[in-house]
Structure formats: C-alpha cells, structure tokens
Amino acid sequence: MSVSAMFVALQGALTADQDIREEIRKVVQALEQTAREMLTLPQGVHQGAGFQDIPKKCQKAREHFGTVRTQMESLKTKFPADQYYRFHEHWRFVLQRLVFLASFVVYLETETLVTREAVAEILGIEADRERGFHLDIEDYLSGVLTLASELARLAVNSVTAGDYSRPLRISTFINELDSGFRLLNLKNDSLRKRYDGLKYDVKKIEEVVYDLSIRGLNKEATGGAGGEK
C-alpha cells in the first residue's frame, strides 16, 4: 500500500469516528435539555409552599424520566457496544446530572439513598458493565455528592419554611452518607475533589441543626411540630 493510500484509509477512519461523535452529541444535547427541564421540578421545593407539593413535583419529574429512557435507547445505537469508554466523556456529565435528579426525587419521596441499580433502572440503562451501556460507579458517586449539596441547601430553606424536623433528618442522612464515602479509597482526582466538598455540606447542615438547638426549635421538631415529609 502506498503512503497516500495509507493516509486515505486513515482519513476514512477519522471521518467515521467524527460521524459517530456527532451523532452522540445530538442525543446528548437532547438529554441535557431534558435534564434542564427536570431540574426545575424537584428544585421547586425550595420555593414558598413547595414542601406541600413534593409528591406532585416528584411525580412530574418521574414522567420526564420516560423521555430520558427513550433518549438513552437512542444513544445506545450510536456507537459499538464494546466501545463505551471510548466515547464516555460525551455523556458523562449529563449522566451525573441525571443520577443527581433521580437520587433527589427518591430522597424527597422516601428520604433514603437510591441504589446504583435503582438509578440505572430509572434511566433505562444497565448497572452491570458487562451488559452494555451502564451506569459507571464513579458517575453514580458524583451524582450522589451533588445530592448532598442540594440537601444542605434544603436544610436551610426548610427552616425558612418553618419545617424544623426536616434538617434533623437531613443531618442524619448526610452523616450516614459521609460515613459511607469514608469507606471508599477514591483514586479519581475529580471525584476525590468532589468528595472534599462533602465536609462543607456536613458542616453547613450541622450549623443549621445547632441554630435550631440554640433557639429551642429542635425540641419542637422532635416533638412532632415539624413539617411533613
């Protein structure tokens, strides 16, 4: 094969790769738009009487996950199944955002941490990497860390809304989450930096709980006068 023929073949491979990436980008852009639309729903709990509308907001968010599953099915068809990590960077951030949204909705519904397997099911993908397009463990953990920041914000806004029991429950949840992360030996630099931010979320929530204690409102909360879940 001549040198020119070799480079023609290389250009063909480059073009094919670029075409795949362009098709992936189109689907990812649609996923990002869906995620933006979804974000306004659960975050509505921070506003005014949002706590009374939690079930309704969660239900609407879950309806959007139907769109996400359809878009995920489309994304799976855009690249060879055995090349997941070759193109992973294209959807990594939106997948982390969707993990956060799923975990926030589940927390608002049950005040528990959603499992990676449950998130994968919500998104219409696999938990096991051997089965194809899957939820990477580090993407799951990144989404959960975003949840921690959101709950720190929720603890503050709960007090403003007169719901004094919620920050206490959030504090218990976040402390358990922090204990869980301490069991991990994180090698990913980005994820480790994200985890470093968890201690600030813990501190922020502790300050809210301490303020409630100083004002005597924690007794009122544990006495059953706090807001509903």
Curated annotation (Swiss-Prot):
Keywords: Cytoplasm, DNA-binding, Endonuclease, Hydrolase, Nuclease, Nucleus, RNA-binding. GO terms for molecular function: endonuclease activity; RNA binding; sequence-specific DNA binding; single-stranded DNA binding. It is found in: Cytoplasm; Nucleus. It is an enzyme of class 3 (hydrolase). It comes from the Eukaryota. Its EC number is 3.1.-.-. Residues 177-198 are annotated as: Leucine-zipper. Residues 86-90 are annotated as: DNA/RNA binding. One of its GO terms (biological process) is RNA metabolic process. One of its GO terms (cellular component) is cytoplasm. It holds the Pfam family Translin. Belongs to the translin family. Exhibits both single-stranded and double-stranded endoribonuclease activity. May act as an activator of RNA-induced silencing complex (RISC) by facilitating endonucleolytic cleavage of the siRNA passenger strand. Ring-shaped heterooctamer of six TSN and two TSNAX subunits, DNA/RNA binding occurs inside the ring. This is Translin. The gene is TSN.
